[in-house]
Amino acid sequence: MDFKYDVIVIGAGHAGCEAAAAAANMGSKTCLITMDMNKIGQMSCNPAVGGIAKGQIVREIDALGGYMGLVTDRTAIQFRMLNRSKGPAMWSPRAQCDRGKFIWAWREILENTPNLHIWQDTVEELIVENGEATGVMTCWGVTFHAKCIVLTAGTFLNGLMHIGHKQLAGGRMAEPASYHLTESITRHGITAGRMKTGTPVRIDGRSVHYDLMETQDGENDFHRFSFMSEPRKLKQLQCWTCFTNEEVHEILRKGLPDSPLFNGQIQSIGPRYCPSIETKIVTFPDKPQHQLFLEPEGETTQELYLNGFSSSLPMDIQLAALKKVPAFKDLVVYRPGYAIEYDYFDPTQLKHTLESKIIKNLFLAGQVNGTTGYEEAGGQGIIAGINAHINCHGGEPFTLGRDEAYIGVLIDDLVTKGVDEPYRMFTSRAEYRILLRQDDADMRLTERAYKLGLVKQDRYEHLCSKREAVNQIIDFAKTFSIKAALINDALESLGTARLTHGCKLIDLLNRPQITIENIAGHIPAFKAMLDQITDRKEEVIEAAEVLIKYQGYIDRERMIADKIHRLEAIRIKGKFDYNSLNSLSTEARQKLMKIDPETLAQASRIPGISPSDINVLLVLLGR
C-alpha cells in the first residue's frame, strides 16, 4: 500500500496532536500516525497541565489556535492560579485533569479536523532522498509519501524501562518501544543521545487515610486556559498533601544498592527539576521530610497520582517506604513507579522553525528534542506543524522571538544552547517576563496566527472585542477627572491617602490599594461604562488593570527588547569561515561552527561566546 500526503506526523502525544492539527487546519493534507489510537494525547506522567511558565505556554498555544487549552478546560477537575502573591508576570495557571477524558477530548477534536487522517501503526524507517525527507515506512509494510515529516515520538525511541534490576523494553508501561527509526535518522548525520525520566506509583484511593493529610482545594473564578471561554463541565475535586519522614528515608537508603540510578544501570541524565525520591534523599541528606502531593486521576476513578515520589527502586522497597507515611499505612497500589531511558536528538541541529539543518523537510518536536513536559512539547508541536505546512505550500517561515512568547524562549534555548539534561521551562529563563504574561497571550499572538490562516474568524473577533474593551477602560481612566471632595471618603475606606486636589482616574488606579473593581462603585460614570462590557468582563478588567498598573515596567522592558532587535536584524549566517578567524577564542570558533547562528543576537546567546567575540564579528561586518 502507498499513500501520499502533504504532512506526516509521527506520534500522537502532545507535540504530535498540536502539529497535526495545525498543519491540517492551515490546509495541508495531513496524516497522524500513532501506535494506539486509544492513547492519543496521553498524559504519560502527572494528570495536570500548566504550572509556572508552563501555563503561559498553554495559553500561547491557545492564542495561536492550538487545542491544549481547550482540552484542558473541558477535562479540568481542579484549577488554580499559581504565584498570585507575586506580580502578574509570574501568575501561572495550572489544572488537574481527568486523564481518560483528556484522551477522548483530543481524539474527538482530531477526528473532526478537516484534512486530517489518523493511521494506527508503528513507523520504522524515515525515507530520505537527496538529503530530503520524502516519506516513512511502517512495521505493517505501508509506505507513506509526504512533502514534510514531523517527528514527535516522545519517549518511545528505543525506550527502556527500569524497576530495580528489572529492565523492560517499552515507551510507556505496557506499551512497546519504537525500534529502527533512530538508526534510520542517524545514518544521515543527525546526532542522537539518551535521556531518562521517571514516574511515581499510582495509588488505590480506597486505601488512603485522607484524614491524616492536608487538603488542597481549587479555585472557581473566571480564569481558564483557553481564551474561548470553555466552561468547566466536570466535578471539581480536591488534592491532598503530606510528607515523608525519617522512617521512609531509612528504607529508601537501604534500597539504594538496588536503585538503577545509583548502581550504574542507568547512565542517562534525568530532569534536574523533577528528581526521583531516591535522588532527593541522597542530594539532601539533612532534610527530614519531603512534601508529597496526592492528585486524582479522574472524576470517576479511585486511581491517584503521587506527585513527588518518582522512583525506579524495586517495587517492594517503594511500597515498604510509602507505608511508613501515616496516611499510607494500609496502602494498595495499582502499579509501581519506574524510570525510562529513550533516544533524543541534539536540538542545535535544528533551525528556529524546528526543521532539521541536515535533512530538509524533517521537523522534530517534543521530547525527541531533549525537553520534558506536555506544555513544552505542545508549544514545539504547533510551531513544527505551522512550518511544515509553510514548507509544503510556500510562505515566510514562522518563528517567535524571545520577547514574543515563552515558546520563542524555549525554541531559541534549544537550538542555540542545546541540552545536556531534559529541558524544562521556567519564568527565570525569559528575559522579558512582563511582556510574556499569561493574561495577554492572545494580544501577542492571535493576530499573527489569524494572518497565517490558523486562527478562525470567531477567535479573531473575540480578540478584537477584548482589545476594544480594554482600550476603552484605559482611555476612560486617562481622561476622566475626579474631584477630591467627591472621592476622599471612599479612598479613606479603601486604606489609601486622601487627595489634596483633583486628579485623573488613572492616577488613583496606579495606587496599590485601588483596583478597578473596588473604585468603580464610587464613580457612577465608570461603573456604567464597565456594566456595558458583557463578554468576558472579568478577563477584560484584569487585562486593563495590569496594563495600567505596570505600564512603566512594560515600556522599559519593551525598550530593552527593541535594542536587542537591532542585533537580531544583523544576519551573519554564511558570512564567515569561523575556523579562520584567529581573533576569536578557540571556544568561540568551535561553538559558532557547531551552531551556525542566523543572527548576531543568536550568536551572543551561545554559551561560551563572550562580548569581545561579538565585538570582533561587529568589526568584521564593518559596524
UniProtKB/Swiss-Prot annotation:
Pfam family, one: GIDA
Gene3D superfamilies found in the cross-reference section: FAD/NAD(P)-binding domain, GidA associated domain, C-terminal subdomain, tRNA uridine 5-carboxymethylaminomethyl modification enzyme MnmG/GidA
SUPFAM superfamilies attached to this UniProt entry: FAD/NAD(P)-binding domain (SSF51905)
GO terms under biological process: tRNA methylation; tRNA wobble uridine modification
Protein origin, superkingdom: Bacteria
Keywords, alphabetical: Cytoplasm, FAD, Flavoprotein, NAD, tRNA processing
GO CC annotation: cytosol
Record text on subunit structure and interactions: Homodimer. Heterotetramer of two MnmE and two MnmG subunits.
Family in the record: Belongs to the MnmG family.
PANTHER family xref list: GLUCOSE INHIBITED DIVISION PROTEIN A (PTHR11806), PROTEIN MTO1 HOMOLOG, MITOCHONDRIAL (PTHR11806:SF0)
Protein name: tRNA uridine 5-carboxymethylaminomethyl modification enzyme MnmG
Organism of derivation: Phocaeicola vulgatus (strain ATCC 8482 / DSM 1447 / JCM 5826 / CCUG 4940 / NBRC 14291 / NCTC 11154) (Bacteroides vulgatus)
